[in-house]
From Swiss-Prot:
Its cofactor is Mg(2+). One of its GO terms (molecular function) is glutamine synthetase activity. It comes from Halobacterium salinarum (strain ATCC 700922 / JCM 11081 / NRC-1). PANTHER family: GAMMA-GLUTAMYLPUTRESCINE SYNTHETASE, TYPE-1 GLUTAMINE SYNTHETASE 2. This is Glutamine synthetase. InterPro entries: Gln_synt_N (IPR008147), Gln_synt_N_sf (IPR036651), Gln_synth/guanido_kin_cat_dom (IPR014746), Gln_synth_cat_dom (IPR008146), Gln_synth_gly_rich_site (IPR027303), Gln_synth_I (IPR004809), Gln_synth_N_conserv_site (IPR027302). It holds the Pfam family Gln-synt_C. Mg(2+) 2 binds at residues 143, 198, 205. It catalyses: L-glutamate + NH4(+) + ATP = L-glutamine + ADP + phosphate + H(+). Binds 2 Mg(2+) ions per subunit. It is an enzyme of class 6 (ligase).
Amino acid sequence: MTNGDSSSSALTDNERAVLDDIEAQGIDFLRLQFTDILGTVKNVSIPAHQAEKAFTEGIYFDGSSIEGFVRIQESDMRLDPDPETFAVLPWRSNGDGGSARLICDVVDREGNAFAGGPRQVLKNVLARADDMGYSVSIGPEPEFFLFEKDDDGNATTTAHDQGGYFDLAPKDLASDIRREIIFTLEAMGFEIEASHHEVARGQHEINFKYDDALTTADNIATFRAVVRAVAEQHDVHATFMPKPIGEINGSGMHSHISLFDEDGENVFADNDDEFNLSETAYQFMGGVLEHAPAFTAVTNPTVNSYKRLVPGYEAPVYIAWSGVNRSALIRVPDAAGVSARFEIRSPDPSCNPYLALAAVIAAGLDGIDTDADPGDAVREDIYEFDEDKRDAYGIDTLPGHLGDAVTALESDPVMQDALGEHVCEKFAEAKRHEYAEYKASVSEWETDRYLEKF
């Protein structure tokens, strides 16, 4: 695969290892992947023999054609593959050859990191954490639905099964699909911890092990692609839409967060505390609670996201924290020592994982900087509080719709700084357009309720 010329001498050890893997595993094509500002995975496919050129020169593309990137007069951009993200795509491999993927960073024509690249936004926030002496560990729990297709192959909202929480077959018809998803993920380097049927009919969860924040964001994007690909092979449709069916639980992406110092010690841990959390953990938590209204536009980025964030369906609405109370935005699991952490429960799996993690981490780091106070734990079901009781506890609510969430994002200097001017401007523009389209639409609920009444 290498040819001994000056370009090959510029390869890193990791890049050389990828070239060796490509040859050893009979890879014919490489998918070079990145995400647009909304989190949609984009890719360009190249013959495997172009891999060395991709590493040494990059692959050019038209940035003006990508949502949230650049204007046409600034359109020349380049993909730089990250060799540590190399993975064979099991569903694209056979005896005649196979395909693999590399996740890429985006640079401009001068070779500078593109400030509007979501992966770069997360890298910038993690660099700030590193300057403060921390690495960030994230463990996500993405949920998804499996739906039947109609005779024309289009997705429906007919659940693939009628199972419930932790059900077994025959109610859980998707156990074999989850099993194949797990095998595929493991073949791509994931460490799977558990899988099960979720509360709602047709709803599922597969948990993979926590990792550093950048790897976790890459893994979330990969996870969504794998779930969809395996579902297609079984002629069902997988969706990460937060609330595809009313009156049942929606899909979230609860995320467990902890910080580690340069010696690998969990700085969130304090075994003398009631919740096994340190002062640093409470400061970080305080920052997350303070900036939650602003980052909600990023962690819950669709009109549909706010159909999930309503009382009564195990999704958070109120900005508070608790030990075991799932009505709060933040829950502290019963864990100590190296496992000390807290869980933020609002994100949903439709988010751009790079921007969502960047926003939450930036909020927490600001809390450490400002010695933010999260207040006392709420030990009661907040869903049962009336407005006066919530006011007495000082409990605010998350934005009720996408429009309010975008306004909060645009009003928060910490989020503006973390995401960068380019991303904030382009993201807000796209989301305001989406919300305006939604407000102008007429739903089936409205026609069912009013068409014959008036």
